[in-house]
Design a protein with these regions (language model features):
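A short, N-terminal "cap"/entry segment at the start of jelly-roll beta-barrel domains
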Residues: 1-40, 50, 119
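Short strand-coil-strand connectors
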Residues: 33-34, 70-74, 97
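Short beta-strand/loop turn elements enriched in aromatics
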Residues: 35, 45-55, 111
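Short hydrophobic/aromatic-rich beta-strand segments that constitute the beta-sheet cores
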Residues: 40, 69, 102-104
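Short, conserved beta-strand element in jelly-roll/cupin
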Residues: 43, 53-69
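A cytosolic small-molecule/anion-sensing beta-strand core signal
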Residues: 63-64, 80, 98
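Short acidic-glycine-tyrosine-enriched beta hairpin
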Residues: 73-88
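Ligand-binding loop in jelly-roll beta-barrel domains
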Residues: 88-114
Length: 119
């Protein structure tokens, strides 16, 4: 597979670009009843995200390509099928090679849909 299935890419769930922390991403989000979120991101180009932190844990699963979790000077490369948990409050950012797809689970609301963005 080179992309997520169409049913996972409903335009109503498209993540607004201000939630991406990295240019060139295409993302979709689903919400849990407890306020958690699952996000699916694909990118066509290489990129490095902005450093940030969350008030909740983040789980990352690399599906395709390579995603590198960066925490301070530590770099954790994730190949397809590899996963990592970023504890809440930890400053981090990610790096992607072209064609990378990832799934992220957040213990709180992280992503804003295009339809929710108030600019």
């Amino acid at each position: 597979m080179n992309d997520f299935p169409e049913f996972m890419k409903n335009p109503k769930n498209r993540i607004h670009s201000t939630s991406d922390y990295m240019a060139g991403l295409e993302g979709y989000v689903f919400d849990g009843a407890d306020g958690s979120q699952i996000a699916f991101w694909s990118n066509r180009n290489a990129g490095t995200g902005a450093e940030h932190k969350h008030p909740y844990d983040e789980y990352v699963l690399a599906v395709e390509g390579k995603f590198t979790v960066c925490i301070g000077s530590k770099r954790i490369p994730l190949a397809p099928g590899e996963e990592y948990v970023i504890p809440k409050g930890v400053l981090h950012f990610g790096e992607r090679i072209p064609g990378t797809r990832t799934i992220h689970a957040f213990g709180g609301k992280r992503a804003v849909r295009e339809s929710e963005f108030k600019g």
